[in-house]
Amino acid sequence: MINFDYRCLTGEVITKEDFEYEEERKAWNRAIEKYPLVIVYCKTEDDIRNAIIFAKNNSLSIRIRSGRHHYEGYSTGNDIVVIDVSKMNKIYIDEKNETVKVQGGTRNRELYKAVGKKGYPFPGGGCPSVGVVAFTLGGGWGYSSRLLGLGCDRLVEAELID
């Protein structure tokens, strides 16, 4: 077994040796049993960059996780680096331009609450625990799609981290 040096990782780092690993590795679909090498809960873009660099330097695959809500478990895997952005869930509402900016970990329930307070609709899905970014990148079909269009129809801009 290879010993990895996790000291270059920032954010909250969970490895197989940590007490909370067993609970933190689980997906929404409890039938998915995957065992990632490390889970990095990112709070900043630098945390994400450091996790990507760690994975690249160690020839490890990565998965991005925001809500753990995927039927097939694509946000996790065996012996990989899980970059979890669920703690990056800030929402910025620009009423002048009628736009909303969300961080990668924002979930439907958080966005519905924020825009609902301002009287705005969001063409999100019916499950509150689904991540908004994953929902949108998957096309974004929801109960209000006939009225508001798909979630991806409302995407104005995306920022990627390399």
Regions found by a protein language model. Give the residues of each.
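Active-site and channel-lining beta-strand-loop segments
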Residues: 91, 150-162
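N-terminal accessory segments
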Residues: 1-148
